[in-house]
Amino acid sequence: MTIRHQGQQYRPRMAFLRKIEALVKDMQDPDTGVRVQNQKVKVVSIPHAMTGSDVLQWISQRLWISGLEAQNLGNFIVKYGYIYPLQDPRNLTLKPDSSLYRFQTPYFWPTQQWPAEDVDYAIYLAKRNIKKKGILEEYEKENYNFLNKKINYKWDFVIMQAREQYRAGKERNKVDRCALDCQEKAYWLVHRCPPGANNVLDYGLDRVTNPNEDQKQTVVSVRKEIMYYRQALMRSTVKSSVSLGGIVKYSEQFSSNDAIMSGCLPSNPWITDDTQFWDLNAKLVDIPTKMRVERWAFNFSELIRDPKGRQSFQHFLRKEFSGENLGFWEACEDLKYGDQSKVKEKAEEIYKLFLAPGARRWINIDGKTMDITVKGLKHPHRYVLDAAQTHIYMLMKKDSYARYLKSPIYKEMLAKAIEPQGTTRKSSSLPFMRRHLRSSPSPVILRQLEEEAKAREAATTVDITQVMSKLDRRSQLRKEPPPK
């Protein structure tokens, strides 16, 4: 059986029809398919008819599924018009009894995508009106009158086509005429379903373009493709064993911190109605949990991503007289993700504070990066300081981060960290005894608390005499000659 698919790939949520069609093809196999035979329906012997029970039995045996699953799948096949009932056409369900069904011809399958237009439906209704001598169902009469008003300018063409099709149908033998009428009726029951029925083919608006369509190649597109393949050749290839080993190592390291896989302590607030978890893991809590502090040692990004970890790291950098590095990194993050209407003002402020000669919090970056940054500041945008930010980030990662993990500040934080104990869920069968679930802390409030903490840190004065005495002591040690 040769079946053409016309544009099915761009229809959303309809890819499963291909699988149904593959199953229907197997059902029509003369050797291993469903048993079919001639059946008499209303004095007419219909060829290739089958019973609903035979279809369900074949589906169960073919797919190794239960009777309930086979019934559900059979209903889908009937609703989408691949099998249609002969005795009760409007009942689009598969009955598990001796009710007769027949396979729909592939021309009327949904994936053929010839549009069910108003003109075709009007011709079908006009043909039925001629055949039944005006005796149509109520919803068909309404549709007939509506289409008569809608396409009145071509109604003569509709009537002429209906008469021609009716005349051609009368020339066929009785069996073929009855089979074609059943197929056509089943098609329109699916595509123009009666009132109250579920329209299974309603998938929304068509896409303007087909994403799978071959686009015309231009000089620009070919150049982009060549550039892409050249870059792909330059990439270093990694063995799959190395990649999989990295994934396994990462999973083992982070499994204890996964709230879904390992649970969360003291308890899940959405289940137990206990907000202690949110209180212990607030952004700038005084004493963090042990699991949170241990996570800072996984990698530098985990430390700098956590507001509390960043606060502790800033305290360490200030003792090493390099707190301006983290301050510059935070200012660059605010430039990228903050209010974009103030990009120019923020960029100028960052330059005066960190990059200008003699700046109050001057940072040490190489000359090449400084030249790139200064040139970019002539036309500032949110990513103008990326080169300098990356340089400072790598400097902190390779130099300061390792010393921080060995410092007394981190060890003291780890020693004081809280290790919460798990709590049991308290529930009550009486609704009035249950506490109302609370929502998580508001991000606005947490942001305000974080900004207030930053303001307090910025307001703290530095004892300049203490700093100068340390610098003098260092210079004095350098000048003293080593003992002989």
From Swiss-Prot:
UniProt keyword annotations, A-Z: Membrane, Phosphoprotein, Sensory transduction, Signal transduction inhibitor, Vision
Stretch forming the signal peptide: none
Domain RGS as annotated: residue spans: 299-414
Subcellular location: Membrane
Post-translational modification remark: Phosphorylation is decreased by light exposition.
Any GO CC annotation of this UniProt entry: neuron projection
Gene Ontology biological process: G protein-coupled dopamine receptor signaling pathway; intracellular signal transduction; negative regulation of signal transduction; regulation of G protein-coupled receptor signaling pathway; visual perception
Domain spans labelled G protein gamma: 219-280
Coiled coil spans: none
Lipid bilayer topology: Peripheral membrane protein
GO molecular function, one term: GTPase activator activity
Role this protein plays: Inhibits signal transduction by increasing the GTPase activity of G protein alpha subunits thereby driving them into their inactive GDP-bound form. Binds to GNAT1. Involved in phototransduction; key element in the recovery phase of visual transduction.
Subunit structure: Heterodimer with GNB5. Interacts with RGS7BP, leading to regulate the subcellular location of the heterodimer formed with GNB5. Component of the RGS9-1-Gbeta5 complex composed of RGS9 (RGS9-1), Gbeta5 (GNB5) and RGS9BP. Interacts with PDE6G and GNAT1.
The protein's name in its UniProt record: Regulator of G-protein signaling 9
Protein species of origin: Bos taurus (Bovine)
